[in-house]
């Protein structure tokens, strides 16, 4: 499966992580290549969308412009990959620089979005405080339970959130649905926008990617 590893060009650690991620994908059937990420400095080169009303991104816009522009840059990377998925007319994987491939892709069948790192995602320090984490079954399953849900008062409210966007696969159908929602309602923080109201979310175990490197936390600026 064509796999795009997001990194920031010129950021030494980001480039090192990206190279390690691609190396981990060797002989895995994840056909990985670098994908230069958008930054606040290059954001104006891409189509601009308004943020959804009463959402997470709107809070950042009023409270911290730097974080807002960084979050918007991160989201734009997803949009570019979704468009690439439709252009290629085949499933692709979105993988962040600090992810590591741990097993071979075996052409799992999924509908729209498949979380590729479900077990390690919930073990991230950011979720240490989260209670009632989901019990995960072997194989591909619908993402029907999560303690992470959308709390803001808009059309996404009460949907289940993807537990970060470290590694996921998406089909052209899933990409089209997310882009349609974007055009209609606007954008939000990436792991708030990819939710169960917007797209059919599924997970797979054993997972294909995990975290072995320290999180650079680049979604909050760098």
Regions found by a protein language model. Give the residues of each.
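An acidic/histidine-cluster motif and surrounding catalytic segment
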Residues: 1-95, 99-222
């Amino acid at each position: 499966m064509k796999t795009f590893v997001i990194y920031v060009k010129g950021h030494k650690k980001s480039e090192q992580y990206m190279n390690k991620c691609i190396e981990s994908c060797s002989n895995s059937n994840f056909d990985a290549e670098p994908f230069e990420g958008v930054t606040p400095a290059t954001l104006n080169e891409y189509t601009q969308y308004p943020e959804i009303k009463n959402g997470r991104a709107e809070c950042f816009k009023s409270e911290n412009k730097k974080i807002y522009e960084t979050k918007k840059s991160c989201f734009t990377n997803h949009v570019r990959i979704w468009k690439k998925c439709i252009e290629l007319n085949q499933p692709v994987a979105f993988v962040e620089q600090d992810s590591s491939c741990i097993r071979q892709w075996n052409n799992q069948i999924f509908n729209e979005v498949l979380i590729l790192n479900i077990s390690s995602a919930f073990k991230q320090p950011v979720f240490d405080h989260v209670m009632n984490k989901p019990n995960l079954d072997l194989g591909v399953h619908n993402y029907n339970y999560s303690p992470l849900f959308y709390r803001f008062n808009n059309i996404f409210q009460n949907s289940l959130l993807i537990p970060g966007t470290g590694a996921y696969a998406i089909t052209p159908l899933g990409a089209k649905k997310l882009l349609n929602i974007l055009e209609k309602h606007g954008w939000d923080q990436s792991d708030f926008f990819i939710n169960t109201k917007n797209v059919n979310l599924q997970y797979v175990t054993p997972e294909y990617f995990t975290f072995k490197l320290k999180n650079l936390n680049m979604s909050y600026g760098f």
